[in-house]
Amino acid sequence: MKVFKISHLVKSEDLNHHGTLFAGRTAEWLVEAGFVTAAAEHGRPQDVLCVNVHGFTFKRPVEKGDILTIYGRIVKTGTTSMMIHVKAMCEIAVGQNVEGFITFVCVEQDTKKKRPHNIVLDETTDPEELELRERALHVQ
């Protein structure tokens, strides 16, 4: 599936009491990237709602002045739901900093009843994507 990316400059107002990127701000950015991925693939942002943040694994801190790029891609679909894998990586201090899975659903605007999104996972031979799809099957 297509990979979407968003970058953020880590500024003073994004920091915690340790002087590194606040986990709450990171979570906000990860959910935003997940939403962008789901909405862009679906084509109707007004139909897309976040229903579950399955947890994020923080692997290393992010410093002020770094550029954090968040990548999102759909790794699992149901009839009305789609699970997005998001990962954040620093552009300056290279390495993966945080990752996780988020589920979004599509709903009717007026009734808020779930509606099919008609997204089908494409065929892939990419080892990373295959591994993410396998992991997504076991996410609770």
Predicted segment positions?
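Hot-dog-fold acyl-thioester-processing enzymes
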Residues: 1-50, 108-140
